[in-house]
Amino acid sequence: MSHDPLSTDAEVASPAFSDKDNVGGDYSASSIRAVMINRPRQELYDFWRDFSNLPLFMENVKAVEMLESGRSKWTIAGPGGKDVELVSDITEDVPGEKIAWTSSEDSDLDHEGWIAFKDNAFGRGTEVRVFISYDPPAGALGKVVAKVLQREPRVQARGELRRFKQLMETGEVSTSKAPDAAPRADRHF
């Protein structure tokens, strides 16, 4: 599993989000995403570590079931309406700082990853960084189909971190209607 430092605080301090793809790892596709969240590090870690909270902001996660010995079974909406089951083993758990995992032998998707929580160098908020490495089902074709359908883990991670930030800072995840459905101010004269 890749544990290399991939950016400095300065690289993610000014923008709210940072994205990098193909950054290493044991599998053919990898990605790192980072976001600054204006909440204490321990609070963010505690919320994430309770895996039952994850479907609150992860659109495609239908359920997370805790199994024995640090294992969890995830049911995820996959491409074409077919659910994918991921069985993960926690490989590292540093309270308040980091959670790392890898797929178990009975997982539908070979994957590994970690999420790290670090105090912002400027004393405000927390840098949350997620690393994902995986082998796409059905190889390159499966990767393309998943990306087009917005079901690719790298694409999903960006949105999930955005929604996590919204939920932790405001208490809700914002949604928006299509522009045609939203009322327009100029229609109310």
Regions found by a protein language model. Name each.
Residues 2-17, 23-25, 84, 102-161, ...:
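Beta-strand/loop substructures that line and gate deep hydrophobic ligand-binding cavities in soluble
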Residues 72-79, 99-106:
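Short beta-strand segments that buttress and anchor functional surface loops
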Residues 93-99:
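Short, surface-exposed linear segments at secondary-structure transitions and domain or protein termini
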Residues 30-34, 71, 85, 98, ...:
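Intrinsic-disorder/low-complexity, polar/charged segments enriched in Ser/Thr/Lys/Arg/Asp/Glu/Gln
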Residues 67, 91-93, 116-120:
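Short beta-strand micro-motifs enriched in acidic
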Residues 2-71, 158, 163, 167-174, ...:
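Hydrophobic ligand-binding cavity/cleft-lining segments
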